[in-house]
C-alpha cells in the first residue's frame, strides 16, 4: 500500500473505504490504526520518540486538513482526508452488519456508557460488548483490571479514546495482551461526539477541511494549540526544496 512520510511519520495514502476494508480484513496480529493530525506531527517533529511511537501503527490515517495540505505542498498529494471519527463510524456500520463485537474505552466518567447508549439507538443490531472510561492508572493493578475486563468481553474491535499520545502509548505497551482483537483504533475525542457531549462540525465545514475551526469554537481551550499548528504549517518545505533534500 502506498505511503508517504511527513517529519519521519508514515501516512498511508488511502481512501476511507480502503482503510476500513484493510482494517477489517486483518489476520494474525491486530490492525492498529492511528490518526495523525497536524498537531501530532508537529510534536513528532520535535520529539523523535513520538515519531517512533506513531510509526508502530499498522494503519496511519491522514486526519486533518493540515496533513493533506502539507502533503500537497511537498508534492506528495494524498487521495483524501480520513477523519478518525468517520473511519470509526464506518467500522461501526460494518460491525453491525457482520456481527462483530465492539468495545469502547475512553472519555471521562460516564462518557463511554452514554456513547454506547446512543450508538445502540442508531445501530440496533450492533453488539457493543463493553465500555469503560479512560481515566485509570496505565500501570499496575488498575491497568491489569481494565485489560482483564476487555479480554473477558472478547471484542473484535477496540476503540481507544484517551487523547494523544496517551492512547497510542497505552495501545503499544499493552498490545501483547490484546492480540485476539482484530482492530484497535485510537480515535481521540470520538466518544465525546457519540455520547452527545460534543457536536461534530456541520457537513459543509467538514467538506472544506474546517473541522479544526469548529472544534476550537466549541472548545475555546483549543486555541492554545494554534501556535503549534502554525509551526507545523510554517516548517513544511515547498516541493522544490523537498526534492533537493532528503525526505522528511
Pin down the residues of each PLM region:
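Short hydrophobic/charged patches on amphipathic alpha-helices used for structural packing
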Residues: 51, 92, 144-148
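Short, compositionally biased "basic patch" segments
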Residues: 56-67, 108-121
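Internal alpha/beta domain cores that form substrate/cofactor-binding pockets in large enzymes
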Residues: 103, 107, 111-119, 126-153, ...
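Structural motif
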Residues: 33-35, 61, 157-161, 185
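A transmembrane-helix-recognition feature enriched in membrane-embedded lipid enzymes
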Residues: 66-71, 200-248
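Hydrophobic alpha-helical segments and helix pairs
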Residues: 68-105, 109-110
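N-terminal nucleotide/polyanion-binding subdomain common to many enzyme families
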Residues: 1-86
Amino acid at each position: 500500500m502506498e505511503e508517504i512520510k511527513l517529519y519521519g511519520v508514515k501516512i498511508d495514502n488511502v481512501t476511507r473505504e480502503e482503510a476500513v476494508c484493510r482494517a477489517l480484513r486483518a489476520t494474525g496480529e491486530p490492525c492498529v490504526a492511528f490518526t495523525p493530525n497536524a498537531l501530532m506531527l508537529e510534536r513528532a517533529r520535535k520529539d523523535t520518540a513520538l515519531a517512533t511511537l506513531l510509526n508502530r501503527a499498522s494503519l496511519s490515517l491522514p486526519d486533518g486538513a493540515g496533513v493533506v495540505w502539507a502533503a500537497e505542498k511537498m508534492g506528495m498529494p494524498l487521495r483524501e482526508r480520513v477523519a478518525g471519527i468517520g473511519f470509526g463510524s464506518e467500522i461501526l456500520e460494518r460491525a453491525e452488519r457482520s456481527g462483530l463485537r465492539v468495545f469502547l474505552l475512553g472519555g471521562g466518567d460516564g462518557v463511554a456508557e452514554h456513547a454506547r447508549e446512543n450508538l445502540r439507538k442508531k445501530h440496533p443490531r450492533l453488539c457493543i460488548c463493553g465500555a469503560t472510561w479512560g481515566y485509570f492508572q496505565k500501570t499496575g493493578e488498575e491497568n491489569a483490571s481494565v485489560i482483564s475486563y476487555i479480554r473477558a468481553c472478547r471484542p473484535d474491535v477496540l476503540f481507544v479514546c484517551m487523547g494523544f499520545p496517551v492512547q497510542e502509548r497505552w495501545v503499544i505497551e499493552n498490545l501483547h495482551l490484546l492480540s485476539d482483537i482484530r482492530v484497535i483504533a485510537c480515535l481521540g475525542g470520538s466518544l465525546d461526539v457519540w455520547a452527545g457531549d460534543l457536536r461534530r462540525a456541520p457537513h459543509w465545514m467538514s467538506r472544506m477541511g474546517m473541522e479544526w475551526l469548529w472544534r476550537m469554537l466549541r472548545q475555546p481551550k483549543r486555541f492554545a494549540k494554534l501556535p503549534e499548528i502554525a509551526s507545523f504549517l510554517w516548517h513544511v518545505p515547498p516541493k522544490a526544496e523537498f526534492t533537493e533534500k532528503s525526505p522528511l
